Amino acid sequence: MMAVMAQDHPIFTESIRRIREALGPTALDPLEQQVLERLVHSSGDLTLGGLLQFTPGACDRGLEALRSGAVILTDTAMAAAAVAPMAKRTLGTQVRTVLEWAPDCAPQGSTRTAVGLERAWNDLSGDRSSPLLLIGSAPTALERLLDLVAAGA
């Protein structure tokens, strides 16, 4: 069950309660369940549960990374704006967007977001833990991330 924080707005708390009720029982562990509830809350799509797959322990590792100071890196300013208030009031996590690293003009065959993601990943992954990526609506950022992971980044 998701822990309700003192700062959670009553409308948010009620929304999560209704989402949980509509979803019914799942086989997800508590952290995975919270991810699902947040995704449904953000998208309004109750069918997302059937599409989610988690690597065992991924949520625990992500939470530990956040507790260790990992940055949340988003593909869009809109995604950053959506998660920044909760990130700030829970663990004080810094939220940044790949657009901070994006060139003014994308090279031919690429996008500003894809170039920005690669630059941000390389910059933020240095001596610290890699950033946690939140991809909202830029498919080229996701494609570049998958390329980086495949290359061993």
Language-model features: where?
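Flexible, glycine/proline-enriched loop segments at strand-loop-helix junctions
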Residues: 2-6, 49, 107, 129-135
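Electropositive, gly/pro-rich neighborhoods at or near active sites that engage anionic ligands
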Residues: 2-73, 81
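Short glycine-rich anion-binding loops that position phosphate/pyrophosphate groups of nucleotides
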Residues: 45, 77-79, 137-140
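Short, well-ordered, mixed-charge alpha-helical segments that flank or form enzyme active sites
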Residues: 81-82, 104-106, 141-144
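Long, charge-dense
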Residues: 87-130
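Glycine-rich phosphate-binding loops that contact phosphosugars or nucleotide phosphates
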Residues: 112, 117, 121-128, 134-153
